[in-house]
């Protein structure tokens, strides 16, 4: 069943409200919303340290995936046939953060190779998958359960990159 304009607006706003709320709850900065995509970053304007920022980011992604499953069930119950899926790419690294643009239009955003790698990982991810880079994995491996996906060829990078698929948080023993 195709959605009319008002239904599509409600559908998209419900999704974006849910996901952006999760991003903010975990301390992320919402960079931009492009259609049904949300770009979120951690570490600016406030960083809790590189490792804590990485753990918060991956934890946010896990929470988003769980919330998306609930939204998908709700939409399916409402009779929506084409239910979107979720894919995410996460990388940790240096980038340039600031206001970019012209005197007519400025965006507070981030640029650089690290940002490009996160985008490429998102493109390489399967439906419902969160792919993280080796640099992120090294920071979160004691808190997050992951599977090594091996080397992935990514556009714009001369060598393949090692990627990990996020499973879930590691359960802490009391």
Where are these regions (language model features)?
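Catalytic core regions of nucleotide second-messenger enzymes
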Residues: 26-27, 31-34, 65-89, 151-154, ...
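Alpha-helical scaffolding flanking metal-ion-dependent phosphate/phosphodiester catalytic sites
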Residues: 57, 90-93, 114-117, 121
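Cytosolic regulatory/linker segments at or just downstream of nucleotide-handling modules
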Residues: 95, 118, 124-174
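Cytosolic nucleotide-binding catalytic cores of signal-transduction proteins
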Residues: 18, 36-40, 60-68, 86, ...
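Catalytic NTP-binding/metal-coordinating core of nucleotidyl cyclase/transferase enzymes
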Residues: 1-59
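A short glycine-enriched loop-to-beta-strand structural element that forms part of the catalytic core
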Residues: 41, 81-98
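A short beta-strand-to-alpha-helix junction
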Residues: 54, 64, 110-114
């Amino acid at each position: 069943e195709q959605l009319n304009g008002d239904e599509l607006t409600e559908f998209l706003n419900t999704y974006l409200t849910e996901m952006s709320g999760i991003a903010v709850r975990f301390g992320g900065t919402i960079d931009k919303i492009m259609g049904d995509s949300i770009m979120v970053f951690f570490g600016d304007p406030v960083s809790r340290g590189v490792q804590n920022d990485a753990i918060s980011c991956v934890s946010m992604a896990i929470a988003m995936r769980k919330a998306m499953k609930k939204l998908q069930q709700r939409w399916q119950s409402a009779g929506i046939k084409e239910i979107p899926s979720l894919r995410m790419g996460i990388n940790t690294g240096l980038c340039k953060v600031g206001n970019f643009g012209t005197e007519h239009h400025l965006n507070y955003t981030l640029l650089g190779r690290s940002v490009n790698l996160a985008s490429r990982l998102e493109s390489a991810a399967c439906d419902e998958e969160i792919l993280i880079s080796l640099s992120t994995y090294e920071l979160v491996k004691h808190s997050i359960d992951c599977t090594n996906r091996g080397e992935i060829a990514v556009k714009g990078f001369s060598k393949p990159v090692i990627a990990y698929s996020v499973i879930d948080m590691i359960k802490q023993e009391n």
